[in-house]
Amino acid sequence: MPNLPHLTPSSLRTLRDVLGKDRLRRNVPLAPYTTFKIGGPADLYFEAQTAEELARAIQVARTLDVPYFLLGMGANILIGDGGFRGLVVRNMADRIDVRPEAGRIWAESGAVVYPNVIDAAVDAGLSGLEHYVGIPSTVGGALWQNLHFLSPPPERTRTMFIEEVLLEAELLTEEGDRRTVGVDYFEFGYDESILHRRDDVVLAATFQLEPGDPARMREIMAANLQWRAERQPPLDPEPSAGSIFKEIEGIGAGRLIDECGLKGTRIGGAEVTHRHANIMINRGGATAADVRALINYVQEVVARETGYELEPEIAFVGEFDPPSDATPVVVPEEDGLVSAEERAVFRNEGVEERRKG
């Protein structure tokens, strides 16, 4: 049994009884469940299929004082090579209920924003969510980070936030209560919400939308997908966690990194992609130690050359080894391609299986 400081044999029996003996798994590699395809094993792993199962898993972990981490699509995070000492609850609660007459759509927090929630809204002629097409996120993750994207073409003059269409959400609070709260509860900001400061868990959310023309919404979706494809690497074949650093008001983090000549910089299997300087990709076999070393290096160079301090946007989860001491190298753009073999490994098995081979 993994060394869990707060887990007694009695506690383990309780977890099995509450979550199901056959559904509580041990020593599960987490790399395949993240968009970075990086991360060691979880001591304990459970997949919640409904909001009720999600609440039950969190409640029993809290009662037993077992460390836990709630995993959605696995974007915007870097899991350490040592994995997670505790219980990882993967949120797969994904029911969706469209209420066209009220202009509303309700979804459990594990529902994937795109395509599932957005397509359901567009098919019902409800507008407001189509702007967030192509961003890997669950409903819970969208509220965690106040999901955002640029306004529709051709203007693209302002940033649109998920808070603008959120009506209310159902929570399991850090105190253990089930509550329905309005948008003001979340104290939203840029990449920010109260969920960063409180141990509340989103169980479901309701969005208030407007009647819209499905054809026009599909046009916006296609334009946004094209815009993203031109500027950001696809997760297949180039796994990433999305933007690595928070934006600096008035100047983009990617612009600073690019001006410092850091595109193509690689440490181990981690690389600053030529497509977008604020995105690092897993070129195959990258470790969390590689990524941490590359993050540190980029921060040091940008601070030295520009005076700006870059702050990571991604969350660091679990146990980390010391950053890699490999020497940074710059890879020419024409070499920044991933082979078909690497694509197959990422898609079917994840990085852990690649290492075994």
Task: Tell where the protein language model's regions lie, with residue ranges.
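Short, low-complexity, charge-dense intrinsically disordered segments
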Residues: 1, 349-356
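Eukaryotic N-terminal low-complexity, Ser/Thr- and Lys/Arg-rich leader segments
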Residues: 2-5, 346
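Anion-binding (especially nucleotide phosphate/pyrophosphate-binding) glycine-rich loop
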Residues: 4-145, 149, 356
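Intrinsically disordered, low-complexity regions enriched in serine, threonine, proline
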Residues: 10, 340, 344, 351-352
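Phosphate/pyrophosphate- and phosphate-bearing ligand-binding catalytic cores of soluble enzymes
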Residues: 25-26, 32-35, 77, 172-296, ...
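Glycine-rich tight-turn/loop motif centered on a GG-T
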Residues: 43, 152-155, 283-288
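Short, basic and Ser/Thr-rich N-terminal targeting/leader segments
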Residues: 64, 71-73, 164-165, 238-239, ...
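C-terminal structural segment of proteins
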Residues: 78-224, 256-258, 264
